Amino acid sequence: MADILTKIEAYKREEIASAKRARSLSEVLAAAEAASPPRGFVQTIRAKLASGDYALIAEVKKASPSKGLIRADFDPPSLARAYEAGGAACLSVLTDTPSFQGHLDFMVAARTATSLPVLRKDFMFDTYQVVEARAHGADCILIIMAALDDAAAKDIEAAALDLGMDALLEIHNRAELDRALKLRSPMIGVNNRNLRTFETTLETSEALAPHIPKDRVMVGESGIFAAADLARLEQVGISTFLVGESLMRQADVTAATRALLARGGQSSPQVVPANAGTHNP
């Protein structure tokens, strides 16, 4: 995990330095303060859960390091609307280019197309990125505990909270959980993917969930493909899920999203080629 994150940090630091040369922090901060108000990411999830529904953070994701291109027919606004029609509570949009072929413009387009709160899914190493995220309309950022020391995580979280944003604290093990619990953000995501092998297992969430206080919003991430997976994680108190790849591969994203969120469902939606179109009913 450390080797992968070290390589990622190296290119992100270069990106950040380049961005700062192109646009000063004061300029970006002015844009952030002028941006439309945050939509309340955690608030929206809690409202969804209070109504008795699952809360889905649906991901707009073109590619990944482990799977390569996921969807050739990639149109962020259409995908965002399809997710919203299917019952998603929030959106997650990849903005990292080297590893995920993402872009900040994709996040802007997805947010503009819907009324849903949006997470900027990227590797955060500098508070500049947080301000940049808000300037582009992000309602939430990702903090990967494995990538940051405690001081950096605290600074990045503070920058987000000061701008009215939420933060998703991502963990992979008990040590990272203990560190995350010292921060202020109530939303903790358990990533079921082993960053060394890229293998996923829901057992990671099942093992860590009992150690997460019940007043926190627990999010299951990675390795979630069917309604049965949601039902399995619900048994350990996880009712919020971040799902990308399995939905991005569907021809009818809206129908696939509805099927995933249907309680009592046991079958996985039919997987179709990644270049299939997006169709809304």
UniProtKB/Swiss-Prot annotation:
Listed EC numbers: 4.1.1.48
Catalytic activities: 1-(2-carboxyphenylamino)-1-deoxy-D-ribulose 5-phosphate + H(+) = (1S,2R)-1-C-(indol-3-yl)glycerol 3-phosphate + CO2 + H2O
Top EC class, one word: lyase
Pathway assignment: Amino-acid biosynthesis; L-tryptophan biosynthesis; L-tryptophan from chorismate: step 4/5
Keyword Lyase included in the entry's annotation: yes
A molecular function GO annotation: indole-3-glycerol-phosphate synthase activity
Name listed for the protein in its UniProt record: Indole-3-glycerol phosphate synthase
Source taxonomy: Bacteria, Pseudomonadati, Pseudomonadota, Alphaproteobacteria, Hyphomicrobiales
